[in-house]
Amino acid sequence: EFLKMVEAISAADGSSGWVASFGMNPAYLAALPEETLKEVWGDSPDIVFAGGIFPPQPAERVDNGFRIKGRWKFASGCMGASLCGVGILPAEEGALPRMAVLPRDQVKVDPTWDMLGMVATGSHDLVVEDAYVPEAWTFVRGGKPNVDTPFFRYPSLSFAAQVLAVTTLGLAQEALDIVRAMAGGRKSVTGAPNLGEHEYAQIALGKAEAKVRAAR
């Protein structure tokens, strides 16, 4: 049902659909310790999370936590976030990449995003000058969730891939619908056939429709 909603929103506006897709972020955050999850959602379910994962930045382990700094790109929705996550790579040998979660006021948003057609995703850079993040506020991205319900048993990285893919599915379907409407329009003043009466257009539209259906 969530995927269907994201697809419908994306058909109306691609940027809105892209940002709406990140409503699945609780699937990521479920890998935080249980006590941290209570702090995140203990007072309200209306917590907006945005993440800048790449490139992961080196993190020094200190006092049961990490000292972090750096710049992370493509943090969609960060302007309206209450919590921000950034990708870190602990310094110790063999450590897995993690995500560190910080309050929005500890993160600077550098407005670098000005992409034609998708500017409203607000996928700006995140900058952290120097911050301490307790280990309890970090997690391995895609790690085992600490919430045992059907939703959280589904692999979070697989879910993330699906919600992002369905955004483009909504855009593609809307584009097809627009072309179909144009193809059946009025004939030109010269009496030439409209687009939909041309065999090459029918074939191209049919192939495109087949690709969208196969992707769905």
Functional labels for PLM-detected ranges:
Residues 116-117, 121-213:
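Glycine-rich beta->alpha junctions and the first turn(s) of the following alpha-helix
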Residues 5, 68-70, 128, 172, ...:
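Buried hydrophobic positions in well-ordered alpha/beta secondary-structure cores of metabolic enzymes
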Residues 1-81:
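Glycine-rich flavin
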Residues 47-50, 115-119:
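Short Gly/Pro-enriched turn/cap motifs at secondary-structure boundaries
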Residues 71-107, 122:
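DPxDG-like acidic metal-binding loop motif
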